[in-house]
């Protein structure tokens, strides 16, 4: 089932799945951790991410990492992916 969010000031809709993929790719590609504010700023004014959608995407990404060798963590300056301690010796 596809979840759509409509911004009250816009005719554009963003799918939560797409928001999640954008957030994941942005954090993965960033040379330093990204804050929530920086992630929201990635979305243009004519197609903004709905309030709460970035936080939801981060939560979903963190859960999806449960069975992976990486984790999405929050540090002082924002969010980043890092290798989990349990597999660190092999990487």
Please place each PLM-identified region on the residue numbering.
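Phosphate-centric recognition/catalysis
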Residues: 1-12, 18-19
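Short acidic/histidine-centered micro-motifs embedded in hydrophobic/aromatic stretches
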Residues: 26, 42, 57, 75-78
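Short amphipathic alpha-helical interaction segments
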Residues: 49-60
């Amino acid at each position: 089932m596809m979840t759509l969010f409509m911004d009250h000031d816009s005719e554009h809709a963003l799918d939560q799945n797409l928001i999640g993929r954008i957030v994941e790719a942005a954090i993965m590609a960033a040379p330093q951790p990204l804050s929530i504010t920086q992630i929201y700023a990635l979305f243009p004014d004519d197609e903004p991410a709905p309030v709460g959608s970035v936080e939801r995407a981060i939560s979903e990404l963190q859960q999806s990492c449960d069975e992976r060798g990486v984790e999405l963590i929050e540090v002082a300056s924002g969010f980043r992916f890092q290798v989990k301690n349990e597999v660190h010796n092999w990487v």
